[in-house]
Amino acid sequence: MTSMASIANRQNSYWLSWEKGYLEACEAFGYDTNVQTNNGEVQTQQQQFDSAVSNDADFIVGQTYTNAAAITLAETLVEAGTPGVLAVTIADWYVPQDAGGEYVTFFTPHFVNHAYSAAKMLFEAMGGSGTFVHIEGNRGTAPNIGRNKGVDLALEEYPDIEMAGSRQPGNFIRSDARDVMNDKVSQYGDDIDGFFGQNDAVALGGITVLEENDIDVPVVGIDASEPGLAAVAEDRMTGTVSGMGPWQAGWSVAKCHDFLNGHTLSDAEKMMSFNAPVCVKNPDEWTDTIDRLPVVDAADYNDAIFSGETPYDWKKMSVVESGEDAWDPQIDMQPMNLDDMKTVLDWKEEDKPNGYSLPGAYTDSAAQEETTQLYADRFQSNPLE
């Protein structure tokens, strides 16, 4: 039995940790592995999918680099009869059912909750007042839009906090974040009281400029990358929210394994979101402030994810392997209804294609409640706590 995983690169710890989860899960379920890097190039990723299906891969897992690419990649899976999971990025007004059964499921971090929690942590660390810099990521992408919404939501609760001018894009990379922070420091200087980085790379890029200018302020990021966790340990960052790379990959493998062995997800399970932990140096200081996400020790998280094998029981994620009453996602997951899609993925009613209608499960409150309860009941163990 063979598989293929599609990742952007091996240059950052998020993708390295994602690859680690994929390799571990495939070993647990007995699949040969094949990791392909696409460097964020849609055409390269499409060629890799085409090659995998022509070589009779049993399943494909990964993330699409652009929203629109999700459609053509999903169609490739369905036309070949090859099951797959495409996570995190999906086209507007498009769900797995629009492609076909082989698009096993879509899931994504709850970008809004993650950024809201990180922003609350930052604003509390700032003492509830002052001016902060917010450097965003790639404009127009769901992670960036959702995280902006989360920060704005937190701002509503802190009337004495203000943003240092408008957000500027750091494109999720250090060098661009440095350029933006240089501009912000020249404009605001010592009036900067905090910094929100749209991911750890942005946070770390901005920190270097702040440090060069002797500006010592609270900083938060998102991803819980190795460099980000190191910055938390060194008190250069207050905290970082995990991207859960290994879990994302392993969950994808488990769902494809279930599909290949006759278990299909309900309609409401086809679009899911998850909540990841906030990684800090002293969790007890933050458990009362952070109410939407779990709070974990950054050093313990670093050991669990990046040192040796990850703590997940991959077979436990499989309904086929563990049984209907014993499987466990090992993370907090919820189905996405239409409102969630609009909030987290930034779907707008005016962009809906003429004549398009979502499958009923996404607006059926009973189906949503049943699925929410199912995943709450099955979430029995959190290996990171």
Where are each of the predicted segments found?
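A residue-level marker of the well-folded mature domains of exported/periplasmic proteins
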Residues: M1-E385
